[in-house]
Amino acid sequence: MLIILTGLPGVGKSTFSKNLAKILSKNNIDVIVLGSDLIRESFPVWKEKYEEFIKKSTYRLIDSALKNYWVIVDDTNYYNSMRRDLINIAKKYNKNYAIIYLKASLDVLIRRNIERGEKIPNEVIKKMYEKFDEPGKKYKWDEPFLIIDTTKDIDFNEIAKKLIEKSKEIPKFYVLEENKNKNNNISDKIDKETRKIVSEYIKSKKLDKDKIKEVVELRKEFLKKIKKMEEVDADRVLKEFKDLLNSY
């Protein structure tokens, strides 16, 4: 069984996944929690060039573990394309999957982020909130099995019971919509990578709120310009954005 968590930073995914795993384990379920942070935090420092390796390694771990165990994916998975890639792994082994959508208001996410020492710049969380692909809004296969408000009490025993029942069903897979336009994939990559570049830049420069807003706006205008281009080379564009930021 593949359990795909989706939700923004500060919503409580890691706490949720650990608590759920404990309850499932008490029900004699062999379960493992996996996510990109497991690998990302193994690097002593973060560099943008590591991200492709981190993504591929995370997927390989999930792919390998799903053969024998239940897997809880502890990641934001905020684009439906990310959730689709994970569902394809479940499909590969004919395993059931369940998307669990963890929700909280933007105010709560920001407050929690501040309480943990602003691990991620608040402006980045706000942008992710705006860009978030809400599960089930566009595709049938993307509909959440459960929607959880993490500001309320959570009954993990009841959630575990529902997941165990679902795991006994015959897996059903809808036709997954693929990105027909290559530029959509490139745009997703550029959007994600420039977000990371900005996040790292803000952290390294220790910018104040006004400067953060300026940098976020700079990225926004840069992406508008890129969207007007017919042919886009992602690597060249990312280098151009880094140069722009460094000269700012």
Swiss-Prot record:
Pfam families: KTI12. One of its GO terms (biological process) is tRNA wobble uridine modification. It comes from the Archaea. Pathway: Aminoacyl-tRNA biosynthesis; selenocysteinyl-tRNA(Sec) biosynthesis; selenocysteinyl-tRNA(Sec) from L-seryl-tRNA(Sec) (archaeal/eukaryal route): step 1/2. It catalyses: L-seryl-tRNA(Sec) + ATP = O-phospho-L-seryl-tRNA(Sec) + ADP. It is an enzyme of class 2 (transferase). The keyword Nucleotide-binding applies. Signal peptide: none annotated. InterPro entries: KTI12/PSTK, L-seryl-tRNA_Sec_kinase_arc, P-loop_NTPase, Ser-tRNA(Sec)_kinase. Its EC number is 2.7.1.164. ATP binds at residues 7-14. Keywords: ATP-binding, Kinase, Nucleotide-binding, Transferase. The keyword GTP-binding does not apply. GO terms for molecular function: ATP binding; L-seryl-tRNA(Sec) kinase activity. Belongs to the L-seryl-tRNA(Sec) kinase family. Specifically phosphorylates seryl-tRNA(Sec) to O-phosphoseryl-tRNA(Sec), an activated intermediate for selenocysteine biosynthesis. This is L-seryl-tRNA(Sec) kinase. It comes from Methanocaldococcus jannaschii (strain ATCC 43067 / DSM 2661 / JAL-1 / JCM 10045 / NBRC 100440) (Methanococcus jannaschii). The gene is pstK.
